[in-house]
Amino acid sequence: MAEIKPFKAVRPKRDKVSLVAARSYDSYTTEQREARLRDNPFSFLHVVNPGYKYSQVIEGEKRYNLVRNRYQEFKEDGVFMQEQTPCYYIYKIVNHEGVAFTGIIAAASTQDYEKDIIRKHEDTLEYKEEIFVKYLKTVGFNAEPVLLTYPNNDTLAGIISSVMQTRAEYEFTTTHRDTHYLWPLSEALVVSEISEIFKKMPTLYIADGHHRSSSSCLLAQELAQENKNHTSKEAYNYFMSFLIPESDLKIFEFNRLIKDLNGLSKEEFLIQLDFSFRIENRAQHFYKPSKKHHFSMYLDGDFYSLYLRKDTYEINNALQALDTQILYKLIFEPILGIKDVRNDTRIAYTDGKKDMAFVKTAVDTKEFAIGFGMLPVTTQEMKKIADEGLKMPPKSTFIEPKLRSGITIYEF
């Protein structure tokens, strides 16, 4: 039984939302970030980059405290207002290609995370969790929701569709030509019905935001120990999430680029590859795999198709069946000598939206020696990994929608 609940969001006033909403800090180039901070005093980037006010880079506890100060200033200056009644928020994003993502912004339970009702498919890094726990404890809010997915539900879809027939509280288009819509929903009977629908769902799945959700859970445990009157219903026992149906989730692959062939000649490398894959040289013809366990490779001016020789590789669980794991186990580790795909500087990743033409250019310019492409992970594969308690290799999925910060804020 999944528990979600409505909350009183702090959010921008209607005339400011398009100016406040910001992509994740790291998604901007230095030049883009500088331009937005210089030209837009309402950007949420001012909150998360408080040192800009003094032309200083501020880090650690000092930064966290100043983030809190900037946030309070936005509230004091009337940029933000707080909802008077707990709401669910129907949220819709239509990207520049016309693809729509529609779901519900709500507070999800850290206890559900602990009980594996909310399931994970990625490993988290302890040092990142420690940093983010300190950050959350100081600032006291979530500004970017964790992306969760749930099985398609006709009743829930009907409720959402009905709400979207009314005028949206927010409707704005970004410079990326993505259009955002938000409907606060406070009607008690409908709110209760939504909560009951989720209570009947045995599991939810994290699509994006593993570090944010794990850090929220760790913080809840810490604050519970500090609170002698802890009831498990305090706001810190929840984290902001955006829940979308599985059919709306879009998963793209990450292609791989490798700096060198680990001292092997092209011919020596291909011979070693031949033991595990059937290899076909496709010359200059772009090749994108059409089946699982088929791979595209670009090397020395030629595209190759690689087909796994099934008698050379044993598949006993969902992880072993993943194409990213097959590349690691049969090529990267034994042939190219890459044992740590997270930290080895010889490997780089490019999301599948850039396609194999991007990979070709990176190899042709001699920045990399070889590139690999594959089909994206499916939602069912992602769920199976989570259900079996396994974790995907790093950079196995590039997931949309990518969410903006500052549209709704959850305080705890």
What is each of the regions a protein language model found here?
Residues 1-412:
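Surface-exposed, charge/polar-rich loops and edge strands
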